[in-house]
C-alpha cells in the first residue's frame, strides 16, 4: 500500500516540477527573443543582425516544440499517477 501511494504522490510532484521547468524555459526563451530583437534593432545593422535574429527565432521555434513535448509528458505522467492513485484507493480502502 505505502509503495503505490508513495509512487503516485512522487509522480505528481515530478510532473509539477517538470511543468514548472517548462514554464521557466518558455519564459526565458521569450525574454531572450525580446532582448535579441531589441539589440538587433538598435545596435546592429545589416546582415549580421538579420542572421543573429533569424538564429534566435529558429531556436525559439525549436524550443517551443520541446516545451510542448514536455507538457505532453507532464500530462502523461499525471495520467499514470491518477491510475496508480485509483488502484491504491480501490485496493487499500
State each model region's role.
Residues 1-93:
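N-terminal secretion-targeting helices of virulence/extracellular proteins
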Amino acid at each position: 500500500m505505502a509503495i503505490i501511494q508513495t509512487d503516485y504522490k512522487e509522480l505528481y510532484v515530478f510532473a509539477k516540477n517538470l511543468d514548472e521547468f517548462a514554464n521557466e524555459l518558455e519564459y526565458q526563451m521569450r525574454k531572450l527573443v525580446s532582448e535579441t530583437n531589441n539589440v538587433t534593432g538598435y545596435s546592429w545593422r545589416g546582415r549580421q543582425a538579420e542572421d543573429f535574429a533569424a538564429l534566435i527565432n529558429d531556436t525559439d521555434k525549436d524550443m517551443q516544440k520541446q516545451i510542448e513535448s514536455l507538457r505532453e509528458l507532464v500530462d502523461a505522467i499525471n495520467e499514470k499517477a491518477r491510475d496508480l492513485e485509483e488502484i491504491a484507493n480501490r485496493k487499500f480502502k
